[in-house]
Amino acid sequence: MNIDNLVQNITPELFERLQYGAATGKWPDGTPLSDEQKQQTVQLVMLYQAKVAQSNEQFTIGANGEMVQKTKAQLQKEFNSDNEIARFSEHDL
């Protein structure tokens, strides 16, 4: 079986199930994964992240096949963007 073809046919719903299994060691219905399933699930999640999702989120696999790691300054810049709704000081509360 062609791995690229396999990864391209993973639906977003299936990816969520695989991601859950890789993170918890169980399928969403509570059934534990075997050791072989754990290894294969992690590999599929990494392949999907690199080839389909192409996310630049922290600790995902980028399009170049390497783990995305950001500096503290990069993360602070992302989280301190103009997405703030309100900011309060101690005296306002």
From Swiss-Prot:
This is Uncharacterized protein in dagA 3'region. To E.coli YeaC. It comes from Pseudoalteromonas haloplanktis. Pfam families: DUF1315 (PF07023). InterPro entries: DUF1315.
